Amino acid sequence: MEFGYFTLSDNHYDDNTRSSNQFVADITAEALYAEKVGMHSAWIGEHHFNSLGVLSCPDLVLAYVAANTTRLRLAPAVNVLPLHHPIRVAEQWATLDLLSGGRVDFACGRGYDKREYLPFHVSFEDNQGIFEEGLELVRKLWQTEGRISHHGKHYRFDDVRITPKPIQRPLPTYVGSFSKPSIELAARLGCGLIVAPFAAAMSFGGLKQVADLYHETSAKHGKAPGRLMCSYFTHFADDKAQEDAARARQIRYYKECVIPAFPGDPKSAPPSYRYFIDIVDRLHKVKPEDLTENSVLLGSSARITETLKKVEAAGFAEVILYVNVGLKPHNQVKDEMARFMTEVAPAFASSRATAAA
């Protein structure tokens, strides 16, 4: 199992004195450090208007990271595809794949925050259809050598051929999923799947249930399943005081960042987001003692390793680590990244663990 760096650039906290610019600089440094300590990949989320996160252009940050690394794989987590024209998305990520020497993994999703849709004049209510049509177009634009035309419900164009083409054929593509329709889409298209354990536990019962559903659905469509990945909030704690602080940090993230961003109001949540109502209700009620291995990696190196062995057994090929969550200081984030790769990663045969220099 491989391990990567992950962030949603959460900075929306009531008493936060860390500037957006400083956090983007920290994230960039952490992504570079991921290669130094032996991580496999860096996955950077897309958020707009500081509604949850402050990093709106993961493609630009990853282009900088690409120029300053040699082997680290580079990915958005995720590209909010309905906010962008699929032609432009195909061009941007194909270009980064070329410049990085074929190191891009492309992950996309619908997002979940209506506040990010309104200024772009994109329909939040119709974004399932926009997303599906857009994803199929991006993949077609990458894979087709000649010119293509398209006349769909949401996008129409004639005689288009993008350049450059990606080095990787096919370019690895993942669907970010909180729901059964997204799993269905990933399976139907033969895409990989990336999930959040806390949401998987609430919606499906756990990661194994998600993996089973994905494999069953892939078989139904006659497709070989893609690669399974998950993100995990990560906190090292060696005593009760450290564990209590980590739990408080995680709860604060849910309360101040996630709940305001999720479509949890029964009066306004579109039909394709109704499952978020239950997730938000549970997050409102969550207590520090409710944080288990279903949602976080928290505790000693041995405890974290034990949890990840179960994730590996469920069929997941990579875990991306959300270490810099909840205003965790930059130096602590780097220390925990290095500790993970030194004390946890070596227990997994395919990891590329190296000691921090």
For every predicted segment, state its role.
Residues 82-192, 205-216, 222:
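Internal, glycine-rich beta/alpha segment that forms the wall or movable "lid"
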Residues 41-65, 80, 197-204, 266, ...:
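Glycine-rich, proline-tolerant flexible connector loops at the mouths of alpha/beta enzymes
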Residues 3, 34, 38, 46, ...:
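Conserved, mostly hydrophobic/aromatic
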